Regions:
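Non-catalytic DNA-binding core/recognition domains of DNA-processing enzymes
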Residues: 38-41
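FIC/Doc superfamily catalytic core
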Residues: 1-33, 43-53, 59, 63-536
């Protein structure tokens, strides 16, 4: 066998070994998971990255060293695997981190604190500025106080509430509020408070329950201390800020989380639109003129929206795929051209969205159009890839059934098992929101936060935004590719730092610009591919 053939066979063997482990749902590996030669080849080819000595995560040869995607995608699996290997069952995440995870907050932290009776009180640096600190502790959860979630050992919600430091209530009020509101059995909290007695913590939690409209739970805590222990509980408010209504008692954490995000953010959107001097919502008087503007802005919108996602788009390509005689079935060039297929899918989806906009400006409800339409728009986006055999039709019939990760972001979208409920909650929030500006801005943000599909979420979120803007008589608003960094940074601030201000200002300013520059949008010329890559 020639040397080149031997190398090719060795590469295939290494990749086959990696695929076998991947098919088991694994992203994190130990030295012994591979034959030494396979491991060396995978590292050299860029398919593995070493995190710590003897610990590896799956990567991609296309990733730059600064790219955080592979690390963030593997982070929680690494934490579970590393500490299970090091301490067995003798470890638990901090009460604060436990509470965050119970509240469906999967954001990758800068540092994670782990307790174990066998810990060495050391900090270990991890990739991209993250770290772990293992804290030796004699106090470990009993079987009743522990919970295991995706291999991560946590304090139960009740015990985490009792053990978090008081400053956590103000620093992470949304996480605390979600867990308080989702608690069904208050007896678990009372049990953790009275054995041993913690009257100060009881006062903190009783007031916290009152802040989220759980008077029954607060009274149960106070009365239990009085009846069972003869102790008086003095309530103290640790939130230090108003707590918004989240939803029904016992509702799922993801629904409560989205409701809380919406309520905390809506006034900031209203303020941003006022500051940008965007006029109040109004009915569209000249519907034909409005729709002509939508038609004329299509090429500009398609170029920018697709370029943001990393496709190589030109004015000529957009024009070519928009013609009735464009044929992906019999043209081998079209079959192999992902940019052309994406551009055609965008044209098909835009056509559907345009009809939804037409119905909205004719008096229809933008929330109803979004609820019934967003899955169809997604299907149209990827139908050309189904047509040429690059995707199976069954992958487009529902929300994602796997976890997704965002390139360069610390935000980890909700797990696949809660996506349906999250999207139903989002649609309800939009339907009940009276302000069209709030519908559009928060609808876009939370659509991307949930990330309901395996791909195309950014395009779908921008479509959703424009349908919702139409409900207020606002013009179709293009997010420009030259603003990509500010756009994504503002979304990151909203999702990770809970700061909606940058994103609200960004969208308000773009809407103001669209109002000032209607009815005609300038067309772009031939443009080359941006220097970034496509992300889900």
């Amino acid at each position: 066998m020639a040397t080149s053939d031997k190398h090719a066979a060795a590469r295939r063997s290494a990749l086959s070994a990696l695929k076998t482990l991947q098919d088991q749902g694994r992203r994190v590996f130990r030295t012994g998971d591979f034959q030494p030669e396979d491991r060396r080849r995978l590292l050299n080819m860029g398919y593995l990255d070493e995190v710590l000595r003897g610990w590896f995560i799956i990567s991609s040869p296309a990733n730059r060293k600064s790219d955080t995607t592979a690390w963030h995608a593997s982070y929680w699996q690494f934490i579970a695997g590393y500490f299970n290997d090091r301490f067995g069952a003798d470890w638990v995440l901090s009460p604060a981190q436990s509470l965050a995870l119970h509240a469906e907050n999967m954001t990758v932290p800068k540092q994670i604190l782990v307790y174990s009776s066998a810990a060495s009180n050391n900090m270990t640096k991890l990739p991209h500025g993250s770290s772990i600190y293992d804290n030796r502790s004699k106090t470990m959860p009993t079987a009743d106080e522990a919970a295991v979630r995706n291999g991560l050992r946590l304090w139960t919600p009740a015990t985490a509430l009792v053990r978090v430091p008081e400053h956590y209530f103000a620093a992470s009020h949304l996480d605390v509020s979600v867990v308080l509101r989702s608690m069904r059995d208050i007896g678990e909290v009372v049990e953790a408070l009275i054995s041993p007695p913690r009257p100060v913590v009881a006062g903190r939690l009783a007031n916290a329950f009152r802040q989220v409209d759980r008077e029954d739970a607060a009274d149960e805590i106070v009365d239990s201390f009085r009846r069972l222990l003869g102790q008086r509980v003095v309530e103290t408010n640790q939130f230090k800020r108003p707590v918004f209504g989240l939803g029904n008692v016992g509702e799922s954490p993801i629904s409560l989380r989205l409701r809380g995000m919406w309520q905390e953010s809506r006034e900031h959107v209203i303020d941003a639109f006022n500051e940008a001097d965007v006029p109040p919502a109004a009915a569209v008087n000249d519907i034909d003129s409005y729709m002509r503007d939508v038609d004329e802005i299509y090429r500009n919108d398609a170029y920018n929206s697709l370029s943001i996602e990393g496709y190589k788009i030109t004015d000529g390509l957009i024009a070519r795929v928009s013609t009735p005689d464009w044929d992906p079935y019999n043209d081998d060039g079209n079959k192999a051209d992902h940019d052309a297929l994406a551009a055609r899918g965008y044209f098909q989806a835009f056509s559907q969205v345009k009809e939804a906009v037409r119905r909205v400006v004719n008096g229809g409800d933008s929330a109803s159009e979004l609820r019934t339409g967003y899955l169809h728009w997604y299907q149209e986006m990827f139908q050309p890839m189904v047509a040429v055999g690059l995707l199976q039709a069954k992958t487009l019939v529902r929300h994602r059934s796997h976890q997704v990760y965002l390139r360069g972001s610390r935000h980890v979208p909700p797990q696949e098992g809660v996506v349906n409920e999250a999207m139903n909650t989002l649609m309800d929030l939009i339907a009940k929101e009276p302000k069209h500006s709030v519908r559009a801005v928060l609808g876009h943000w939370i659509f991307g936060y949930v990330h309901p599909f395996g791909d195309g979420n950014g395009r779908a979120a921008r479509f959703a935004m424009n349908v919702l803007l139409a409900g207020g008589g606002y013009p179709w608003t293009v997010i420009r590719v030259e603003d990509r960094a500010d756009y994504l940074d503002s979304l990151e601030a909203a999702s990770v730092e809970h700061d909606i201000h940058p994103f609200a200002r960004f969208i308000a300013e773009r809407v103001r610009w669209s109002l000032d520059n209607r009815p005609r949008a300038k067309m772009m010329g031939e443009c080359s591919k941006p220097s970034f890559t496509r992300s889900p």
